[in-house]
Amino acid sequence: RYRKQGTTDWITVPTEKVEVTGGAFKTCLSGLEPETSYELVAYSDTDESPVTTVTTDIERALPNGGFEEWCTENNIIYPGVTRDEAFWGTGNTGASIAGEVLTDKTTDKRPGSSGQYAALLQSKLAGIAGIGKLAAGNLFIGKYLVTRGTNGIVGFGRPFTQRPTALRGWVKYNCGAITDVGTSQPTGVTINKGDPDNGMIYVAVGTWTPEEYGVCEKETTGDKMLGTDEVPICVDTRDKNTFFNPNSPAVIAYGEL
C-alpha cells in the first residue's frame, strides 16, 4: 500500500501487479507526482512492515528540448547557444563538406507551442568529390566528433541522473519515396527504389563507459578511444561493430517509435 505523505487514505496495489519470487516481491508504482514524498507499507495477511518514506525525482526536461536555441559557427548550424554548449548533435558537420544542411530550425512548430521554432530534419543526397552519398536528417543526444573521408564518427549519450519512465514530445513526419539505394543494406532488410522511407525515434538509458563503448578500432592516428565521460559512445560509420545495439548489456531501458 502507499499514499501521499500527509494524506490519510492508502492505495492498495492490485495483486496482479505484484511479482512474487520465493519470499521476495516487487512492484512498480505509476502515476506518482514529481518531487513528492510517499509512504509505503508492505504487508502479508495481518503482518505489516514499518512505514517507509520515499521522495520522487524532479521531472527534468531535456536541455533545449524545445529546440529554441540555435547557432551558426564556421558556417555550420548547431542546435544550441554555442557549438560547445549544445546538448544535441547532428550530422551537419559532415554534410557541410558537400555544402548541405540536414538539420535546422523551422517556424513550422506544433500548434499551441509557446516557442518560436521546431527542429527540421531532412535526408539529402550529398555530392562529395563527384560521389553521391545519402545523408539522413538526424538529431541525437551527444555531438559530432570527426569526419574521416566521407564517413563520420559521432558521439552518443550525455550524463543523466534521473530515472525516467518515458520520453514525451511531438513529431510530424512527411514520408517520401526512396530514390537512391546504396550497395550496402541492413542485414535481413531489402530496400528498393520507390519504397516509402522510414523515420525513427528511439531513446535509451544505460551505463555505457568510454573504455568499452568509446573505442574506434579503425582510427589509425592518435588515440582510438574517442569517447569521454560526457559522451561515452562512439559510432564510427565505417564500422558496423560500433553501431548502437539496444540489446547491449549496458542498456537499462529502451523504446522506439
Place the predicted regions along the sequence by residue.
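Extracellular low-complexity, O-glycosylation-prone stalks/linkers
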Residues: 1-15
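Solvent-exposed serine/threonine-rich low-complexity stretches and specific carbohydrate-binding patches
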Residues: 11-22, 255-257
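Short strand-edge motifs at loop-to-beta-strand transitions and within beta-strands
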Residues: 23-27
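Surface-exposed, short loops/turns at beta-strand junctions within beta-sandwich domains
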Residues: 29-36
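Extracellular recognition modules
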Residues: 39-43
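Aromatic (Trp/Tyr/Phe) and Gly/Pro-enriched flexible surface segments
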Residues: 50-164, 194-206, 213-257
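Extra-cytoplasmic beta-strand recognition segments
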Residues: 67, 155-180, 187-189
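Extended, low-complexity, turn-rich repeat/linker tracts enriched in Gly/Pro/Ser/Thr and Asp/Glu
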Residues: 173-180, 192-196, 209-212
